[in-house]
Protein backbone atom coordinates (compact mmCIF):
# COMPACT_ATOMS: atom_id res chain seq x y z
CA UNK A 1 0.00 0.00 0.00
CA UNK A 2 2.85 2.34 0.86
CA UNK A 3 4.68 1.56 -2.39
CA UNK A 4 1.51 2.23 -4.36
CA UNK A 5 1.02 5.55 -2.56
CA UNK A 6 4.57 6.62 -3.50
CA UNK A 7 3.93 5.76 -7.12
CA UNK A 8 0.73 7.81 -7.14
CA UNK A 9 2.49 10.78 -5.55
CA UNK A 10 5.38 10.59 -8.02
CA UNK A 11 2.98 10.24 -10.95
CA UNK A 12 1.03 13.27 -9.79
CA UNK A 13 4.20 15.29 -9.43
CA UNK A 14 5.27 14.31 -12.94
CA UNK A 15 1.93 15.43 -14.36
CA UNK A 16 2.22 18.76 -12.58
CA UNK A 17 5.74 19.21 -13.95
CA UNK A 18 4.59 18.46 -17.50
CA UNK A 19 1.66 20.85 -17.16
CA UNK A 20 3.95 23.60 -15.89
CA UNK A 21 6.36 23.00 -18.78
CA UNK A 22 3.46 23.17 -21.25
CA UNK A 23 2.25 26.48 -19.84
CA UNK A 24 5.78 27.90 -19.85
CA UNK A 25 6.29 26.96 -23.50
CA UNK A 26 2.92 28.40 -24.45
CA UNK A 27 3.73 31.69 -22.75
CA UNK A 28 7.14 31.82 -24.41
CA UNK A 29 5.41 31.56 -27.78
CA UNK A 30 3.09 34.46 -26.92
CA UNK A 31 0.03 32.23 -26.49
CA UNK A 32 -1.89 30.46 -23.78
CA UNK A 33 -2.70 26.85 -23.04
CA UNK A 34 -6.26 27.42 -24.21
CA UNK A 35 -4.99 28.78 -27.49
CA UNK A 36 -2.73 25.80 -28.06
CA UNK A 37 -5.52 23.36 -27.29
CA UNK A 38 -7.92 25.15 -29.59
CA UNK A 39 -5.38 25.23 -32.41
CA UNK A 40 -5.14 27.93 -35.05
CA UNK A 41 -7.84 30.50 -35.72
CA UNK A 42 -6.52 31.18 -39.23
CA UNK A 43 -3.74 29.86 -41.45
CA UNK A 44 -3.41 31.05 -45.02
CA UNK A 45 -1.85 33.67 -47.24
CA UNK A 46 -2.78 37.26 -47.91
CA UNK A 47 -3.34 38.53 -51.45
CA UNK A 48 0.40 39.08 -51.90
CA UNK A 49 1.21 35.46 -50.97
CA UNK A 50 2.57 36.15 -47.47
CA UNK A 51 1.73 33.39 -44.99
CA UNK A 52 -0.47 34.51 -42.11
CA UNK A 53 -0.92 32.36 -38.99
CA UNK A 54 -3.33 33.56 -36.31
CA UNK A 55 -4.29 31.94 -33.03
CA UNK A 56 -7.36 33.91 -32.04
CA UNK A 57 -10.11 36.12 -33.40
CA UNK A 58 -9.01 39.77 -33.61
CA UNK A 59 -10.46 42.34 -31.24
CA UNK A 60 -8.51 45.46 -32.27
CA UNK A 61 -8.40 45.77 -36.06
CA UNK A 62 -6.75 48.70 -37.81
CA UNK A 63 -7.57 49.49 -41.45
CA UNK A 64 -5.30 51.82 -43.43
CA UNK A 65 -7.22 52.30 -46.70
CA UNK A 66 -10.69 53.44 -47.68
CA UNK A 67 -11.59 50.20 -49.47
CA UNK A 68 -10.72 48.04 -46.47
CA UNK A 69 -12.37 50.61 -44.16
CA UNK A 70 -15.69 50.18 -45.96
CA UNK A 71 -15.52 46.39 -46.01
CA UNK A 72 -14.56 46.29 -42.34
CA UNK A 73 -17.43 48.58 -41.35
CA UNK A 74 -19.88 46.38 -43.26
CA UNK A 75 -18.68 43.19 -41.55
CA UNK A 76 -17.56 44.03 -38.02
CA UNK A 77 -19.09 45.93 -35.09
CA UNK A 78 -17.37 49.19 -34.06
CA UNK A 79 -16.02 47.65 -30.86
CA UNK A 80 -13.88 45.25 -32.93
CA UNK A 81 -12.26 48.16 -34.80
CA UNK A 82 -9.36 50.08 -33.24
CA UNK A 83 -8.84 52.59 -36.06
CA UNK A 84 -9.70 53.44 -39.67
CA UNK A 85 -8.07 55.65 -42.28
CA UNK A 86 -8.87 59.37 -42.25
CA UNK A 87 -10.43 59.09 -45.73
CA UNK A 88 -13.46 57.27 -44.37
CA UNK A 89 -14.69 60.47 -42.70
CA UNK A 90 -14.87 62.32 -46.03
CA UNK A 91 -18.50 62.03 -47.17
CA UNK A 92 -17.40 63.09 -50.65
CA UNK A 93 -15.28 59.96 -51.00
CA UNK A 94 -16.69 57.45 -48.54
CA UNK A 95 -20.03 55.67 -48.70
CA UNK A 96 -19.58 54.76 -45.04
CA UNK A 97 -18.86 58.17 -43.49
CA UNK A 98 -21.93 57.97 -41.26
CA UNK A 99 -21.16 54.44 -40.03
CA UNK A 100 -17.53 55.45 -39.45
CA UNK A 101 -18.59 57.94 -36.76
CA UNK A 102 -18.90 54.99 -34.38
CA UNK A 103 -15.12 54.46 -34.59
CA UNK A 104 -13.38 57.41 -32.90
CA UNK A 105 -9.80 56.88 -34.09
CA UNK A 106 -8.94 57.81 -37.70
CA UNK A 107 -5.35 57.67 -38.92
CA UNK A 108 -3.95 60.35 -41.19
CA UNK A 109 -0.42 59.45 -40.15
CA UNK A 110 0.01 55.80 -41.15
CA UNK A 111 3.58 55.39 -39.97
CA UNK A 112 4.42 52.03 -38.38
CA UNK A 113 4.88 53.73 -35.01
CA UNK A 114 1.48 55.41 -35.18
CA UNK A 115 -0.17 52.13 -36.15
CA UNK A 116 1.64 50.29 -33.35
CA UNK A 117 0.35 52.87 -30.86
CA UNK A 118 -3.19 51.61 -31.51
CA UNK A 119 -2.21 48.18 -30.10
CA UNK A 120 -3.79 46.31 -33.04
CA UNK A 121 -4.02 42.55 -33.25
CA UNK A 122 -4.70 42.77 -36.99
CA UNK A 123 -3.82 45.39 -39.63
CA UNK A 124 -5.64 45.55 -42.97
CA UNK A 125 -4.06 47.36 -45.89
CA UNK A 126 -3.80 47.12 -49.68
CA UNK A 127 -1.25 46.58 -52.41
CA UNK A 128 -1.22 50.35 -53.01
CA UNK A 129 0.79 50.77 -49.81
CA UNK A 130 4.58 50.64 -50.33
CA UNK A 131 6.07 47.23 -49.59
CA UNK A 132 8.66 48.89 -47.36
CA UNK A 133 5.91 50.24 -45.09
CA UNK A 134 4.30 46.80 -44.80
CA UNK A 135 7.70 45.26 -44.02
CA UNK A 136 8.36 47.88 -41.34
CA UNK A 137 5.04 47.13 -39.64
CA UNK A 138 5.79 43.42 -39.68
CA UNK A 139 9.25 44.09 -38.25
CA UNK A 140 7.49 45.70 -35.28
CA UNK A 141 5.58 42.46 -34.73
CA UNK A 142 2.30 43.57 -36.29
CA UNK A 143 0.17 41.06 -38.18
CA UNK A 144 -0.53 42.71 -41.54
CA UNK A 145 -2.99 41.35 -44.10
CA UNK A 146 -2.49 42.91 -47.55
CA UNK A 147 -5.59 42.92 -49.74
CA UNK A 148 -5.32 43.33 -53.51
CA UNK A 149 -7.19 46.28 -55.02
CA UNK A 150 -9.80 44.82 -57.40
CA UNK A 151 -9.66 45.60 -61.10
CA UNK A 152 -13.03 44.01 -61.81
CA UNK A 153 -16.40 43.56 -60.13
CA UNK A 154 -15.77 39.81 -59.89
CA UNK A 155 -12.62 40.49 -57.84
CA UNK A 156 -14.62 42.35 -55.19
CA UNK A 157 -16.24 39.12 -53.96
CA UNK A 158 -13.08 37.17 -52.99
CA UNK A 159 -11.76 40.35 -51.40
CA UNK A 160 -14.75 40.53 -49.06
CA UNK A 161 -14.52 36.80 -48.39
CA UNK A 162 -10.81 36.86 -47.49
CA UNK A 163 -11.18 39.86 -45.19
CA UNK A 164 -14.20 38.24 -43.56
CA UNK A 165 -12.19 35.10 -42.90
CA UNK A 166 -9.15 36.83 -41.42
CA UNK A 167 -11.25 38.93 -39.02
CA UNK A 168 -13.57 36.11 -37.97
CA UNK A 169 -16.64 37.42 -39.79
CA UNK A 170 -17.19 34.75 -42.43
CA UNK A 171 -20.96 34.58 -41.95
CA UNK A 172 -21.30 38.34 -42.33
CA UNK A 173 -19.12 38.25 -45.45
CA UNK A 174 -21.24 35.48 -46.98
CA UNK A 175 -24.44 37.40 -46.26
CA UNK A 176 -23.00 40.58 -47.79
CA UNK A 177 -21.76 38.89 -50.95
CA UNK A 178 -25.13 37.19 -51.30
CA UNK A 179 -26.88 40.57 -51.30
CA UNK A 180 -24.39 41.93 -53.80
CA UNK A 181 -24.91 39.02 -56.19
CA UNK A 182 -28.64 39.69 -56.01
CA UNK A 183 -28.01 43.36 -56.79
CA UNK A 184 -25.97 42.51 -59.87
CA UNK A 185 -28.55 39.97 -61.02
CA UNK A 186 -31.24 42.63 -60.72
CA UNK A 187 -29.29 45.04 -62.93
CA UNK A 188 -28.63 42.28 -65.47
CA UNK A 189 -32.31 41.32 -65.54
CA UNK A 190 -33.25 44.91 -66.34
CA UNK A 191 -30.58 45.60 -68.98
CA UNK A 192 -29.54 42.30 -70.59
CA UNK A 193 -31.78 42.81 -73.63
CA UNK A 194 -29.87 45.92 -74.76
CA UNK A 195 -27.60 44.99 -77.70
CA UNK A 196 -23.92 45.70 -77.12
CA UNK A 197 -23.64 48.17 -80.00
CA UNK A 198 -26.71 50.08 -78.81
CA UNK A 199 -25.53 50.61 -75.26
CA UNK A 200 -24.87 54.28 -74.46
CA UNK A 201 -21.32 55.57 -74.58
CA UNK A 202 -20.51 57.34 -71.32
CA UNK A 203 -17.50 59.52 -70.62
CA UNK A 204 -16.76 60.18 -66.96
CA UNK A 205 -14.85 63.23 -65.78
CA UNK A 206 -12.84 64.01 -62.71
CA UNK A 207 -12.23 67.71 -62.11
CA UNK A 208 -8.73 67.11 -63.47
CA UNK A 209 -9.86 65.49 -66.73
CA UNK A 210 -11.26 62.31 -68.23
CA UNK A 211 -11.68 59.37 -65.85
CA UNK A 212 -12.01 55.61 -66.36
CA UNK A 213 -8.97 53.74 -67.67
CA UNK A 214 -9.30 50.63 -69.80
CA UNK A 215 -9.46 47.36 -67.83
CA UNK A 216 -9.76 49.17 -64.51
CA UNK A 217 -12.58 48.81 -62.00
CA UNK A 218 -14.71 51.68 -63.33
CA UNK A 219 -14.46 50.21 -66.82
CA UNK A 220 -15.93 46.97 -65.48
CA UNK A 221 -18.60 48.86 -63.55
CA UNK A 222 -19.77 50.30 -66.86
CA UNK A 223 -19.77 46.86 -68.48
CA UNK A 224 -21.98 45.43 -65.74
CA UNK A 225 -24.28 48.45 -65.99
CA UNK A 226 -24.80 47.81 -69.73
CA UNK A 227 -22.81 50.91 -70.68
CA UNK A 228 -19.77 51.52 -72.85
CA UNK A 229 -16.90 53.39 -71.22
CA UNK A 230 -15.87 56.02 -73.74
CA UNK A 231 -12.52 56.76 -72.11
CA UNK A 232 -11.49 53.11 -72.50
CA UNK A 233 -12.78 53.06 -76.08
CA UNK A 234 -10.58 56.08 -76.84
CA UNK A 235 -7.54 54.33 -75.37
CA UNK A 236 -7.17 55.77 -71.86
CA UNK A 237 -4.74 53.62 -69.84
CA UNK A 238 -2.28 54.11 -67.01
CA UNK A 239 0.40 55.02 -69.54
CA UNK A 240 -1.71 56.68 -72.24
CA UNK A 241 -3.82 59.82 -71.93
CA UNK A 242 -6.49 60.93 -74.38
CA UNK A 243 -7.38 64.35 -75.77
CA UNK A 244 -10.71 66.15 -75.63
CA UNK A 245 -10.80 65.90 -79.42
CA UNK A 246 -10.83 62.11 -79.05
CA UNK A 247 -13.74 62.45 -76.64
CA UNK A 248 -15.65 64.57 -79.15
CA UNK A 249 -14.97 62.03 -81.90
CA UNK A 250 -16.79 59.38 -79.85
CA UNK A 251 -19.92 61.57 -79.70
CA UNK A 252 -20.77 60.22 -76.22
CA UNK A 253 -24.39 59.79 -75.20
CA UNK A 254 -23.70 60.70 -71.58
CA UNK A 255 -21.21 62.79 -69.64
CA UNK A 256 -20.73 61.76 -65.99
CA UNK A 257 -19.78 64.71 -63.81
CA UNK A 258 -17.41 64.68 -60.83
CA UNK A 259 -18.66 65.36 -57.31
CA UNK A 260 -15.51 65.39 -55.15
CA UNK A 261 -12.65 67.84 -55.20
CA UNK A 262 -9.83 68.40 -52.74
CA UNK A 263 -9.72 72.01 -53.95
CA UNK A 264 -13.41 72.69 -53.41
CA UNK A 265 -14.47 72.72 -57.07
CA UNK A 266 -18.21 72.46 -57.68
CA UNK A 267 -20.18 70.02 -59.82
CA UNK A 268 -22.60 72.66 -61.13
CA UNK A 269 -19.76 74.92 -62.23
CA UNK A 270 -18.21 71.99 -64.08
CA UNK A 271 -21.57 71.24 -65.72
CA UNK A 272 -21.83 74.81 -67.01
CA UNK A 273 -18.25 74.67 -68.23
CA UNK A 274 -19.07 71.64 -70.40
CA UNK A 275 -22.30 73.19 -71.65
CA UNK A 276 -20.58 76.40 -72.69
CA UNK A 277 -17.45 74.87 -74.22
CA UNK A 278 -17.64 75.28 -78.03
CA UNK A 279 -15.71 72.02 -78.40
CA UNK A 280 -18.65 70.05 -77.00
CA UNK A 281 -21.42 72.04 -78.64
CA UNK A 282 -22.42 69.26 -81.05
CA UNK A 283 -21.73 66.30 -78.76
CA UNK A 284 -24.90 64.32 -78.10
CA UNK A 285 -24.45 64.36 -74.31
CA UNK A 286 -24.50 68.17 -74.32
CA UNK A 287 -27.15 68.58 -77.02
CA UNK A 288 -29.57 66.32 -75.15
CA UNK A 289 -28.50 67.52 -71.70
CA UNK A 290 -27.36 64.08 -70.57
CA UNK A 291 -24.96 65.53 -68.01
CA UNK A 292 -25.41 63.30 -64.98
CA UNK A 293 -23.70 63.08 -61.62
CA UNK A 294 -23.00 59.68 -60.11
CA UNK A 295 -21.33 60.45 -56.76
CA UNK A 296 -17.61 59.80 -56.59
CA UNK A 297 -18.27 57.78 -53.43
CA UNK A 298 -19.38 55.06 -55.86
CA UNK A 299 -17.14 55.74 -58.85
CA UNK A 300 -13.94 55.49 -56.80
CA UNK A 301 -15.09 52.62 -54.60
CA UNK A 302 -13.00 49.45 -54.32
CA UNK A 303 -15.25 47.80 -51.75
CA UNK A 304 -18.75 46.30 -51.76
CA UNK A 305 -19.92 49.73 -52.89
CA UNK A 306 -18.35 49.11 -56.30
CA UNK A 307 -21.28 46.75 -56.86
CA UNK A 308 -23.64 49.45 -55.66
CA UNK A 309 -21.98 51.74 -58.22
CA UNK A 310 -23.13 49.38 -60.99
CA UNK A 311 -26.70 49.75 -59.79
CA UNK A 312 -26.45 53.55 -59.49
CA UNK A 313 -24.86 53.89 -62.94
CA UNK A 314 -27.53 51.77 -64.59
CA UNK A 315 -30.38 53.52 -62.78
CA UNK A 316 -28.97 56.95 -63.68
CA UNK A 317 -28.74 56.22 -67.40
CA UNK A 318 -31.80 53.96 -67.65
CA UNK A 319 -34.28 55.47 -65.15
CA UNK A 320 -37.26 54.05 -67.03
CA UNK A 321 -35.98 50.50 -66.40
CA UNK A 322 -35.88 51.12 -62.64
CA UNK A 323 -39.20 52.92 -62.27
CA UNK A 324 -40.46 50.28 -59.83
CA UNK A 325 -37.31 50.29 -57.70
CA UNK A 326 -36.99 52.23 -54.46
CA UNK A 327 -33.20 51.97 -54.48
CA UNK A 328 -32.29 50.49 -51.08
CA UNK A 329 -28.56 49.89 -50.87
CA UNK A 330 -27.11 46.37 -50.75
CA UNK A 331 -23.63 47.45 -49.74
CA UNK A 332 -23.94 49.15 -46.35
What role is predicted for each listed range?
Residues 105, 111-128, 142, 243-260:
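Proline-aspartate-enriched helix->loop->beta-strand connector
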Amino acid sequence: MRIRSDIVRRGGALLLLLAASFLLCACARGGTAAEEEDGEFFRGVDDMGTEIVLHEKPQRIVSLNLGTDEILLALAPPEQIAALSSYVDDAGLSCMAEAAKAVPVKLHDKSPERVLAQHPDRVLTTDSVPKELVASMRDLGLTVFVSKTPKSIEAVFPRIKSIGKVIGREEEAAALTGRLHERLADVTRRTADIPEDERPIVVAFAFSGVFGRRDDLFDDMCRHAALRNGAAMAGLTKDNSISMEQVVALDPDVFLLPSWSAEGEKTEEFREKLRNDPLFKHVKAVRENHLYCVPDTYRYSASQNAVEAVYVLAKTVYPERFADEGGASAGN
